[in-house]
Amino acid sequence: MAPLHQVVAQVWKPVSNLYQAKYVVCITNNREEADIIGYQVDVEYKASKAGYIYLAPIWYSKGTPVYFTKDPTVADLKLYWTKDQSEVLWKH
């Protein structure tokens, strides 16, 4: 049985000077799934050690909410694109 998923945000990531790609920010309790389906990002995730965060291309969800894990609290979540944490992509 596949783990349930939960979309916590939608973000735009610059792909080039011409356009941006839309991604859904997802939380899953399956590390392998996060590595395979999405793009691992550097995060500061204090609310729950059980969740892994990844970005899935918007087309992966086919316009519907992406499936997800037990409902982790995202009260103290920061998402970064860069390893030096210079750019806060999304903060909840």
What are these regions (language model features)?
Residues 2-92:
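Repetitive, compositionally biased segments used for assembly/scaffolding
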